Amino acid sequence: MQKEKIVVLYGGDSPEREVSLKSGKAVLDSLLNQGYDAVGLDASSKDLVVKLLELNPDKCFIALHGEDGENGRVAALLELLGIKHTGSTMKSCVVTMDKMISKEILMHHRMPTPMAKFLTDRLVEADEISFPVAVKPSSGGSSIATFKVKSLEELENAYQQASKHGEVMIEQWVTGKEITVAIVNNDVYSSVWIEPLNEFYDYESKYSGKSIYHAPSGLCEQKELEVRQLAKKAYDLLGCKGHARVDFIYDDKGDFYIMEINSSPGMTENSLSPKSAAAEGIDFDSFVKSILEQAQC
């Protein structure tokens, strides 16, 4: 039986390029170790379409993060070329990439998520949500240009920094434990509790290697079931497919708040999704294989 040809898409031109390169290398190494006919392709290539047509893969493993991998453009391209790919469809990627659109859908379905809105008139909008608040780009990931703002005096600088990355949203700050749940289609994995290096799980906390991760999270059986059910419902409501990750805050009252859904999570051996799977005895190679097997067009 002829082996499937796999192209791992990584890199790209988003601010998360370096993270994507690490994810792509980890996935490619895993596939090669498992005997797959796999090659890597940097999505920043101006000849991306030509190279994809030349390689003519059976499947593409999307290891892109940020705009290039999560805004639906790459998924749309692969779907038009008839190439099966990991992750969500173009429509779902468009929704999950925009945190405000995602949040509005979740709120419509009465899912627990902090109140938020676009930050257009900074003073008026901030007055409607009591401090502290989170200020961040509506699109993007890795907590780039995300700020905890405690006063009007801090708001201007946060807005200026976040607005470099597109539209800005302001969100009620929720204090509690940071919990995340990885999903691959119908498989909902163990929750992970993150103790960030800094006050919250910002870019430095994510990639400094100094944050502490608890996998499994240590939630009681009832709360573990609750957070998994919430994660799967959010995943389904936003039309996610394949591998995705749902991030929560778990407050001191015992309530979960959905913060965002990531349609193309990190895929190094130290990333959150592999930790979530590892907590259930699934090693990195097996996790990569399970994601690849769910590839669709």
Swiss-Prot record:
The answer to keyword Magnesium applying to this record is yes
Q: What is the top-level taxon of the source organism?
A: Bacteria
What are the required cofactors?
Mg(2+); Mn(2+)
Give me the residues that bind ATP, please. 129-180
List this protein's GO terms for biological process: cell wall organization; peptidoglycan biosynthetic process; regulation of cell shape
Which cellular components does GO assign to this protein? cytoplasm
Annotated metabolic or biological route of this protein? Cell wall biogenesis; peptidoglycan biosynthesis
Instruction: Tell me the protein's name.
Output: D-alanine--D-alanine ligase
According to the record, how does the cofactor bind?
Answer: Binds 2 magnesium or manganese ions per subunit.
**Organism whose genome encodes this protein:** Francisella philomiragia subsp. philomiragia (strain ATCC 25017 / CCUG 19701 / FSC 153 / O#319-036)
Q: Where does Mg(2+) 2 bind?
A: 260, 262
- Where is it located? Cytoplasm
Q: What class of enzyme is it?
A: ligase
Family in the record: Belongs to the D-alanine--D-alanine ligase family.
- List its EC numbers: 6.3.2.4
Task: Show the catalytic activity.
Answer: 2 D-alanine + ATP = D-alanyl-D-alanine + ADP + phosphate + H(+)
The free-text function statement in the UniProt record for this protein reads:
Cell wall formation.
NCBIfam families named in the record: D_ala_D_alaTIGR, PRK01372.1, PRK14569.1
